[in-house]
Amino acid sequence: HIVNGSFHIADAVLLFLLLRLIFRKHLPAFLAALVFLAHPLQTEAVTMVTGLGDSLSVFFVLLGLYLYFRLPERPGLPLYAYILALMSKESAIVMPALLFLTDLFYDFGNHKNSYDSRNHRSRVLPLLPFIGIALVYILLRATILNFSNSFNFYNGEGLFASSVLIRLFTFFRVLTVYFGLLILPVQLHMERSVEIALNFLSPSVIFGGLAFLSLVGLAIFSLRFLRWRTFGFGILWFFIALSPTSNILVP
């Protein structure tokens, strides 16, 4: 409990430092870190021994992001943090995408707060070592580290494993559950199961699908209007971070 709790507190501190660096304001960063620290949904990561992997991976991802933008003259440090994040939990593989997203929305290259002030090539080139590490990790998981069918957790050809559409509908249903727990965190327990969605004609699937399309639309809208960029940044961060466990492409 001490170890898990300590890393959770450290994650909140790093989140505050990163958001303060991004927004250049103390209050929004503090409030976001406070919600992260105290939200009941974090209970599993703090109280369960097996939840340490989540806290560790978040710690190294946030550390890598902070070092990448705070100390650009030390490019090796965030790379080490990325490797440690991957060794903690493989969902950290999305860190290069989070780096690109942050630089795109807040333009740490020249601090002009403009999406068009630098071309995307200059943003992508520093990320090539991170992408290389991610590709090597995927190769290892597909070969010598393929302990238990890495890219298909279902041994049979069930509906969920064989149909991308059903996985997408189920993802919409899961989004409904996620948003509900974020707003009203009740009946929290381990190993929450969600019924597979066989079609779109279900209230939870429809709500999740509409929420997804609306949020993605708002994120795209924010690209054209800087005053909305914080909303777009948060929405895209949420879906990028969720993508490794969404089961849409890989069941």
Indicate where each model-derived feature is located.
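Polytopic membrane enzymes that build or remodel cell-surface glycoconjugates and lipids
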Residues: H1-P251
